């Protein structure tokens, strides 16, 4: 998985990352674009408490969704132009974390991302949000799922049920529920399950961890 500005890795199945429901750090959401940001009662954009340099997008209305797509579509275009095989859309679950966001609007934005990806020859994956996996696969039309720490939170069946083998499972070394060999032996783990360090450091760097279940 790589950012839309990166180049895919030769010989691999490459997934391009897009933050579809929150802003990317440093992205320009000033001017008219600011109408698509979720705001609190004082009018201040709402940030993700865990990622304070990311602000929450509000897809509740058609005009807000249009603005979001105007900003995000170029990134999706880069994914296709750079030769990626698929794209994963992060933070689908913002409407479950921020009640001011309308669920219907979030679902419509997801459908738009799916249509745009398929129209460019890209598969598209749901990122996390286990409680939405059935809807994501059955109603929205995501092709696969990417789950972080489903073993740690006992959620893997929620993904492998709707998506079958089309699940990429990522566990992190600082939050393993059991030795990684035991995670690999679990009957509900995804066919492609990997262990990473939390900071996703590159090979050769201090703290780098990468293991894959056989």
Indicate residue ranges for each PLM-predicted region.
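Glycan-processing catalytic domains of CAZymes
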Residues: 1-214
